[in-house]
């Protein structure tokens, strides 16, 4: 076993005899997860499924002898995961027809089967008892909620009971005190039903994963001020004391499954930091300290970008490829401040591969289901674990970055590491930081968990996606058309072969068959390869570019003075037009004069409100309007 975490425990935190029960429990839960993962090999394949029935069938094939990622065949999530995981085999499962059994029974069967249950048994407790094993936590979902796909995967992977409760709302709502009390009673009821001890940290149940839509905030009588974060309420007693750490997963079937699979199967060895705080007073403590020296000693990569808006924009040309991100900023739900400028969620980097994120910022997760917020945009980019606030938290509510890294290197799970322990800080009480994702996910030093990788095997119930790629490319060559090249490029993008996609794009150009479909399939690869000229050419013939495609245009091309100004002027993004116009206004002034800038501002003002409206009105005065 790697001794680095033990050394860090002794030197960076406190001696074992001084540890609080909560601190001991933090180490214990991380150690239990690590022990479990070392014992369960990963099969080096990804299986793509067309529907939930096929998904559940694949999860039921898992065992303690081998588990593998199962993803819905939906982009951009599937290709994003594959680019990071780099499987030896990518398989497409044959469709399994939907079962007539209640979905609760189907989910429980899949979980129990992954632990050796026979003849359709549904009790994970009985199966675990036969193995003399205690669960690592409990997973709670709703039978009608699409995020049940994550619940099944996490329950099956770790051997956790899966429990079902009713609906409790979603989005930007706030549970009132009466509703919060009722939710506490319901959660406690299902925890009691498991038959495992859960009343205090360090007993049998120390983690709860809520896989369902919930309001991000609630009013709790045990809090010193309301509202508080929903995930910092669940797992506490009425007096506010914590008995479990909670993670929260929500979203579509595809997105929820993606979040679970990222947590379970991806390595996290590359870290990315963006520090926008001044090096003074309390802000300094929330800077990066000695992180740049600490992480390489743990065998981890460390990238620190300039905290200016320009620095962020330059780092994002072609997208960001990393595993764990930490960014600090001031701001609100719809903007964030860099060192020198204020910007909108539109400037949040595009992620080429999945990432976990700690965002030290106020309000970012106020309404995480709304894409055009800071938190919602990060999640739409492919963040699968997220530490952030859902209300004004105060800076000290966050664990400082250097302390966060020490905890992670010492074996704390990612979401657990973000919580203050009782007695350390007044914000250890129920407060406003939400923790999205799997609460058991680790971010340890390199080689701390060496999971065995098993060779995959192809069988008649699967199709090899590489065979599909070969056939599609051959068809495009023999019968060149916009449709056929687009089909081939969709597959090469899925398997993470951007250079091959670019080659197909070039071949389609040579054969004079490029059309809107081919262009649309080319854009993501051209973006990641930073082929700006080709990207612009393709973008011009895409019909009705979607939000992500517009973001790629701006993130790749807006800083380049050779980019034709007309394409940027025609693609100013709402509802944050002020930031786009501010970026290109100097170029418009040179080519179209002040009237060109004012026309763009006047058009944007028709739909503007809030900060966007105020900034546009200020700019209008600046340019003589």
Regions found by a protein language model. Name each.
Residues 50-58, 76-89, 94-515, 524, ...:
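Cysteine-dependent hydrolase recognition
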Residues 488, 521-522, 584-585:
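Structural register within alpha-helical repeat arrays
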Residues 598-625:
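Terminal, low-structured helical/coil segments at or just beyond the last alpha-helical repeat
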Residues 484, 518, 551-552, 580, ...:
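The tetratricopeptide repeat
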Residues 500-508, 532-545, 564-576, 580-581, ...:
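Alpha-helical repeat scaffolds
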Residues 513-515, 544-548:
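Short coil loop/turn residues that delineate tetratricopeptide repeat
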Residues 15-45, 116-120:
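N-terminal low-complexity, Pro/Thr/Ser-rich intrinsically disordered segments
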Residues 3-12:
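Sec-dependent N-terminal signal peptides
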